[in-house]
Amino acid sequence: MTRSRAWVVLVLFSLCLFGGLATGRELFYSLAYLWGGLLITSFVWARSALSGVILERQARSTAAQVGSVFEERLILRNQGRLPKLWVEIRDHSTLPGYWATPGPAGLTADEPGTARAADLPGHRVSSVIAGLGSGRELRWLVRTRCTRRGRFRLGPASLESGDPFGLFRISKDATPAHHLIVLPSTDPIAEFTVPSGYLPGGGALHQRTNQVTANAVGVREYAPGDGLSRIHWRSTARRERLIVKEFEIDPKVDVWIVVDASSMTQSRPPDLAEDQPRGILPRSEVRLPPTTEEYGIAAAASLAFHLLSRDRAVGLIAYGRVRHVLQANRGQPQLNQILETLATLEAFGRLGLDEVIRIEAPRFPRGATAVLITADPRQSLLVATQELERRRVSPMLVLLDAESFGGVPGSAALAERASRRGLRVRLIRCGDRVGNVLSGAAQPLPAWKVA
């Protein structure tokens, strides 16, 4: 539209100039001056329309979680000497979600105002600002309910403006792109029993360590390299020489979470569509997508959160688009790393869970527990668990009932056979509350709640 208008004015200018030269009449010259002046004025106006205009984006964090609200504050400043008639902000973010509770609109000469965001799905930063005076600024807050895990781009954003006649438009890049990672949601688990380590014959797993742990098992004389935190002061005072504490590796076993990310075992309804409600979303109404991939990742995230919060050492294995292996460790950094890995995990793997176990089984220490999360109903999974048991690793199955997700039947029968063999099994169906099932009780829940 802008180009066509400018071309129309240019054609009119050319015709009037040609008519004036051909006839010598002043009317044609006057019209030529008018159209020419309009073109020059509009061009100069458009060129200066974005002079001194700056857009800033301020995010509180580079990470969010499914169900939480991501907030981004935007500041549009006019540092130029001339007022701006209008400025359009165009954003190219890929963050899905739904707008939530923006502030009221308003702009005053003394204090910044708050512009109102559109009630549209997705992270909506794009807007049109009218009448931005010299030296003034406009602030507004974009709040988006995160509904999908993953790594998303925020920006880049560009500014557009033009002349009041709509003949010319100009644009410039305003902010570079940066990324936001949306972590999977975690559902609270009431109880999830993991056995202590064992040796052949049923003995507990005991091993001395040079590291300071919660298990002090005795004292010994000081050796070069021992830290001050190891000194047992009462024994030192009694024996009149430095005595240090000896520690033992925590008898709690390592727990390895193995997620089946094979593309061949995933199920989802054929008519699955984005069915989240539009508009303002209460936190409790963010639903888990009805796919085995999302339920499996939610189960893995919930287990990791539960076990790590109880000082367990947790590792993660998943063969998706790429191979993910996180060594077993404790603490908040390990939880963050596991959740970030699960956030970007895609079920495009080519190896089934039984093949992954055959490859990774030597990695598991003796006495560890392997939690296998899969929607694969094949009997080969039981053969893989036998391989783990031969290595003194305790397997536990978290089966996703593929039939309830629109896939092939067989998960319920596999769960029954595994239970008869003495394996601990949890069967998750579409609509179940994941935390309740992992705790030992299945309960249908229409809406997914975030811990």
Segments and roles (model prediction):
Residues 1-56:
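Extracellular/lumenal glycan-associated context and N-glycosylation machinery
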Residues 2-4, 25, 127, 290-292, ...:
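Secondary-structure junction/capping motif
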Residues 3-7, 243, 381, 431-434:
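Structural motif marking the loop-to-transmembrane transition
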Residues 14, 250-251, 365:
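Short hydrophobic "helix-edge" motifs at membrane interfaces and signal-peptide entry regions
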Residues 28, 37-325, 369-373, 387:
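An amphipathic, basic-hydrophobic helix/alpha-beta surface used to engage anionic
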Residues 297-298, 304-451:
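Acidic, glycine-rich A-domain
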